[in-house]
Amino acid sequence: MALFPRSILIALVLSFVLNLGLVTKIHAKDTLDSIIDILSGLTCETQGVGDLMRTEFSHTCIVAPFFTFAVMNLVSPVLYMNTFLKLKINDSDLFNDSDFGNFPGGQCTRANRIDPKNPELRFALCNNAKLIVSRAKSVAESALAIAKAVLTWSDPWDDIKQAWENKKKEYHIPYRGKPGDDGFAFDVGFPVIYWKVIQDRDRICVSTKGFTGDVPVGCKYMKEPFPKSIYNSFIDVEDKNFIKDPTNDTPSDPLALVSCSAAGEGCYQKAYNASKTAVVMTSPLIECIKQMIARLLISKDVCSFDNVDQVVNLSSRQDSALFQFQVGMYKIVTAFLTLYVMFFGFKLLLAGKVPPKSEYINFILKIIFVTYFSIGININPANGSQYDRLDGMIQWAFPFLLNGINGLASWVMNAAPSGLCKFNNIHYDGSVSYIALWDALDCRVAHYLGLDILSTLLVENTYRSHDFLNFDFFSFSAPPYIYLLIPAIISGNMMLVSLALSYPLLVISVAAFMVNATIMCMISIVILGILAPLFVPMFLFAYTRNYFDSWVKLMISFLLQPMVVVTFMITMFAVYDYGFYGKCQYKSKLIHNSIEDKIQGGLKSKRDVLIFYINNDWDDTSQYPDKDSVESCKNSLGYMLNNPINMAFNFAKDNISEIVNSKPGETTTDEFLSKFQFLSGVVLGPGMFFMSPKVLFEKIKNILLALVTACFTLYLMYNFSSQLAEFAADMTEGVALNNVAIKPQAIFKAAMAALSTAGTATKGIDQMASRGGGARDLGGAKGFVSDNTASSGSAVGDNIAVSRGASTPTVTTTTDSSSITNSITKTVSSDVRSDIVTPHSPTTAFSQHSSISSTIPTSVHNIKPTSIKEIVSNNRESKKEINNTMRSQEKIKSASKALGLIDYSFNLKEHDNPIGVKQIRENAEIRDKRVEVEKAWNELVASGRGRIRDQQSEATSERRTNAEKKWKELVDSGVVTEIRERDNSVTNQFDKLADELDKSKKSKVEENKNITKDIKVDNTNTLPQEKVDNTNRRSGLIDYSFNLKEHDNPIGVKQIRENAEIRDKRVKVEKAWNELVASGGGRVQEQAGVKITERRANAEKVWDELVKSGVVTEKRDNSSNENS
């Protein structure tokens, strides 16, 4: 026995060497296949891995993803993998005889599926012990072949190839089993393998044990028909021969006849084929929602409430959410009924007299009602199955409520006086009869949006019987407001575009609200219906009766709300029709849609389309009972625009017929002339010099009246639609849907906002183009302006920045020749002054201000020639920089330390990355509120208020009172919060000094301090580039350039955010440069013996970081440094 493992090892090595030589010779072209073949021949496990990598799955007939294998290994570690690698089901080399099973073409073909009468599965398991014996036999045969070749000098490879043929039946053990059969397989390595045959719906599987029970490893499908088929959701209902063979006595599955379809004809295709309108939009959505509700409430095997009887007494109801809740509430409902019977019995015993018969009847009816609508009534008392029950919610309540939503709304939708989009007389199948409502809605929306223009022009004109003598072959249903787009596009006026699109956008908004409201009502009815076992038993007792009443009231409210919305839509459509089309009546014709046949490759389509067109048969008294109705239609704006050739032909025909048919002499002259309409239409109006055609003015008047009526209707409907959800809820005493459904004006407002944005962008582009042209014109005079400026000279004042933060203010003066520069300087100064917050001061302060101001003359040769184009460009950059200065909040913080002003914080915060129109609008509102706060604060401080401690004996003016009132409103509303913390280092000293001085001296100190502050703010608000250019001529400062550039016309949130970041970066550069210069740094040549303070070191560190990051670039080759 000790030599037995060694013999096995030697046999395996010889097998490996011989197999390598043989396989390499046979499969020399593919080395990878050779290696895999050798490895797959060693053990059953390696052979299973090789089959998994190179061929289709041999362990199963149903393909599964590799992720499934990983999950199953976690559920059943070791057992699943060992069974998985040894199991064989899909192997044509094995299953071709009586021992393993004879399956021509393979066990997994459609013809060889399992018979439901005899659900037996054939499979095999690989055995390592038999594999070793088979390999040893191959080694022995190979040795004999080699010996024979040595003795006979023949080629041994044919014999060796025959010896090493893969004889799978030698090392596989066949098994057969029906659902429930199990057993064990014993082998070398992992000694025991447990297997069990199970049935999973239409599959028979070989399983093994796992943590969750039986884990299927390999499966095979069963033939049709059989109960609980997974194919029943996509079997064609009309293909009865496929479902049931007349020669086969096997009963067909009732669920296989269900008209559901998840593959061939889904909910979308079913609704699309049943629809009769040209443009299908909403009916597929409603059909899919109805199928989802049926699957949720009844069973996942059905998709319509018409198929309820097919799942009675079947376990497929277990998948129903309502059924599961009913089973859970069974004992609770039984307890309620028991208490009700007990209380009724106590009432009989304690009453002392026999109650009337009506009370007995009421008692019995209540028990039946509660049982029927909560948990269902058992059909067969002898059968205790929980599936065999009559359920009132499934069989009566839900069909009534869900179909009632569409039925009531359909009655109103088809009540249009003009006959447009009436689908109630068209035949629909019983299961899809509700589509008539949504076809009417789609037809209306398509008609008012002009989506059916091509269908009317190409299809309708071909099929309906035209009177071509009236030249009506060029008729199309283009909405009248579409014609406003023509002048709007030509002129670029966005106001006309908004007017032209306002009504169709409102139609889309209200239609979207109707669809959304109907879906939300259906879902709400489903939710309330599932809770029926909880609320229906409350009907038994007076104490809980209110809960049941509220439940029923909500159900009825959700039933009626869509009808209210449809009534509003029909009113809006009717007023629109009358305003544009007068009393025109529509006719319809059901045609076959040959266009779809051509699109589908010539296949015959079952879909027919109902086309509506204006009835131009003026002799049809059923629709035009009097002459006024005919004239109203002919003179309407819509008819004239939709039938231009017909209108011109009718006008010419009427006039020519009167001329031709009339004979002079038969009537008086006045009667004869009255027949000529074109002559009676030419009259001399009062106040007119020329003869005016009266008929033309009549047409224009009718057109204007139609437009005014349409605009007035649009205004009324727009304002009423904002309260449509609340109105529908109040009418039905229910819950408003405006919080859970899209609002009726949502799409309208979003589209109008988009049009407004587009109009603003268009206007901005036009202004930019006009500005660019002006700049180019000014640039043409560059030589003249440069010479003029150079010859005239100017005196320029510089702002000199001194170390330690001190600055000497200067006043800029210019000569007459530099008037352009002077005007620009004044403009910038005025813009800066408007942002600075300072209290009022007496006029005497100007003498002190002038005393510290001085002019610095500058030689003419130091001024560079400047063109008007450069001046305009610099002016724009200056204004842009001024707009990017810090907010008033920051300026007041710096000023409050010196003036004792209270501080405040702005509490509203903008969205960092606004998404959608709503957040962008909120950001705009917050920015407007910030501007309002700044204005209120400036007015408060300018009026003498806003200090931590008020001055004594100071009169309160009306301006101050109003400013305080406005500021108090902002504080009370929570927009701002006052901060009255004081700066003890400066403010207390200032207050102490102010208390010691008299009133006149105190006012002068305040004025001097405010002037100093004005000069400081004025210096800090100028561009850093300008300050450097002015001061480097005096102090030898280095120059720099700001490298970031904003988008000229930012498009989208991303570019707007980038511009904001660049502006923030520019402010950071300004602060860093000012701090560097004020600390004594930033010079081209350092002064000897100057000590570098900590402030300067920090400033230089910040500035170096900005230079290294590429935000700014230093320029140290400035020629003006010679003057330092």
UniProtKB/Swiss-Prot annotation:
Subcellular location: Cell membrane
Membrane topology, record value: Multi-pass membrane protein
Regions crossing the membrane: 332-352, 359-379, 393-413, 495-515, 522-542, 555-575, 700-720
Pfam family, one: TrbL
InterPro entries (UniProt xref): Conjugal_tfr_TrbL/VirB6 (IPR007688)
Broad class of the protein's primary localization: membrane
Record flagged with keyword Transmembrane helix: yes
Keywords: Cell membrane, Membrane, Signal, Transmembrane, Transmembrane helix
GO annotation, cellular component aspect: plasma membrane
Signal peptide: 1-28
GO biological process annotation, one example: protein secretion by the type IV secretion system
Family from the record: Belongs to the TrbL/VirB6 family.
Protein name in the entry: Uncharacterized protein RP104
